[in-house]
Amino acid sequence: MRKNKYITPAAIGCLLLFAAIGLYTIAKDIDRTKSNRDIALTGAGESAILLPADSNELDSVQKVTEEEKAAIESEVLKISNIYRAIYLNAEKVASPYFGIDNIGQKDIDEIENVLISEGYPIINSDSIYPDYLENPDGVYTFWENVKNQKDAETTIRSISTSGSLSYRCFQFLDGKASCLLAGADWNENNEIEVNYVEKREILNWDMTYEQDFYYQDVYLDRHWEATKLIRLHPVNKELYDLTLKYIMPIGYHNVNLFLLNWNADNYGNLCFNDLFDCLYRVENDEYLYADDYPYYTEPYNHSAIPAQLFEDTILPYFDITIEEFRERALYDAQSNTYPWQDISCDNILYYPSLIPEVTDCIKVDENTIKLIVNVMCLDKQTDNLFIHEVTIRTLSDGKFKYIGNEITYTGDIEIPSAQARIPVQRFSEEDTDENS
């Protein structure tokens, strides 16, 4: 089954702040796109990015014709009849989040395989690895036509955890791009019925360096991911396992492990305190809550974390002396605690979602590997925001240590800030340059 994602209470509070300032960001995006409204599509061989024309509102929704609705309903009925028996025989489990019944991944796989064998372009879902499109040839043909300014369309279907059917039809007609979206659910009588149909203007779309397709059909805001990635082939599972194990548990948002250069001889501006909640989650398989620890407002807002817990959580992942660690992490000998700030409206550094992927693993020696990581940010229209190399030392007990990080490539787009959450740990950009 697919994994559920949770938002911490502090992060929820921050969303309220972004609601107040989000319109300003959207307005800037609209001004930028309006200045390019006469640009429809770049020529073949260049980055094929469509920009919105005559967009005067925040809503990208367009009118759906009755003919389009009828065609969708006809196809939904046809496809649902192919997998109806599998759905009816599948074990149903009540979803704790949406008030609907879910079916297991095994049954979803069976449905997908039947539709794949029928030749339909279907999203192949997985409980661990990223979804990807089976029978993707239609997308490649579609994209070649788009680059040559030829009318074209291609349709992608997917099966949800409830067994419902989702439909996306990408269209390029008369130089204008749009996406026709629809969803169909099984009702109480076990009949499929279309519950929504809408059409959205495509604001941007392109192929990544790995020849995966992405598109944007809503305006960029701080409340959601505006761009969606449709992988057209499966990931390299061996490399993706490395991404899952070493990169994703830490990430890039409000933690700087992968955002600046450092090594075991010079930790530079690496902030250990901001790693506490990430590594706590790795060690305990649960989230850390600031309310569980004493909270102080002087000399700055922070939770006081017992030294043993803090050190036992972070130290095993690094080669550093306890003396240097305590100095860098602001150890308070009097209370035998370390300060830690949860992400809040006071310290959050907003950046759109990033997609890291380990593209290579280099064996340095018997116990050391170097991971080459490419980071995409599709909301900023780049599949190569930056590249960094992470050095890992593997241990005999299956654990590991982070030995170093080096940023080897950055483009014209600014990468996420490496600043720490706690004010006294923040640094000047000159300090960053000196330690690079």
For each predicted feature, which ranges?
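N-terminal Sec-pathway targeting helices
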Residues: 2-14
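Short stretches within intrinsically disordered, low-complexity N-terminal or propeptide regions
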Residues: 12-13, 29, 42
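Core hydrophobic alpha-helical transmembrane segments of single-pass membrane proteins
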Residues: 12-22
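Hydrophobic single-pass membrane-insertion segments
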Residues: 23-34
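Mature, Sec-exported extracytoplasmic domains of Gram-positive
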Residues: 32-436
